[in-house]
Amino acid sequence: MTSKKVILVALSGCSSSGKTTIAKLTASLFTKATLIHEDDFYKHDNEVPVDAKYNIQNWDSPEALDFKLFGKELDVIKQTGKIATKLIHNNNVDDPFTKFHIDRQVWDELKAKYDSINDDKYEVVIVDGFMIFNNTGISKKFDLKILVRAPYEVLKKRRASRKGYQTLDSFWVDPPYYFDEFVYESYRANHAQLFVNGDVEGLLDPRKSKNIKEFINDDDTPIAKPLSWVCQEILKLCKD
């Protein structure tokens, strides 16, 4: 057990919403925080379900993830503030420092705010993942729940710009139809219940998405904006 209060922060959303970039940059600003990625809880390639229609692996299915281990790890982190499982991170997102320009003054101001958090009292753990709020058992473990969103066309364009993904055992490249038939369809199917009339391009249903805060991260959003917003949300939970 730890004497500190462990704050679990979830940054979730569809693939290519920008959640991992925001999580990585936040962890770079807040160096006392711990960052883990749900992607590190993918099963081995031969355990990932195969889609009956296309006869390919469905990496965007909830069944592709080891939720039992993920949930167990979150419980251990909540109790101890430390990671217990030896994780293999595949680093499938481009280095955000080479992709985005962040004003030095803004960066320093945000860093100073994070440095003001009393690390004798608080242990902040940031978790980035695409399947968090669809699973009630997982979702309820978090103190701060952030859903990063972007319009369908933006998500599709961003995903298409990626060369592929390192898995535990190989390298995956999306077939041409993969975003529509797997990525977005899985996001819609597993998150529709959080939205009014099940429309994942529409409004969150306050009755179903209780305590989930959203951030719209389209292509017109400067990276400093979500970083500042996430910082303020974390600071609210770490007041002396």
From Swiss-Prot:
Reactions accelerated catalytically? beta-nicotinamide D-riboside + ATP = beta-nicotinamide D-ribonucleotide + ADP + H(+); beta-D-ribosylnicotinate + ATP = nicotinate beta-D-ribonucleotide + ADP + H(+)
* Gene Ontology molecular functions: ATP binding; metal ion binding; nicotinate riboside kinase activity; ribosylnicotinamide kinase activity; ribosylnicotinate kinase activity
Which amino acid positions bind substrate, per UniProt?
39-42, 59-60, 159, 164-165
The metabolic or biological pathway listed in the UniProt record of this protein is: Cofactor biosynthesis; NAD(+) biosynthesis
- Residues the entry annotates as binding Mg(2+): 20, 39
CDD domains in the cross-refs: NRK1
Q: Which residues form a coiled coil?
A: none
Tell me the protein family, please. Answer: Belongs to the uridine kinase family. NRK subfamily.
PANTHER family assigned to the protein according to its UniProt record, in alphabetical order: URIDINE KINASE (PTHR10285)
UniProt miscellaneous comment: Present with 1460 molecules/cell in log phase SD medium.
Its protein name is: Nicotinamide riboside kinase
Its gene name is NRK1
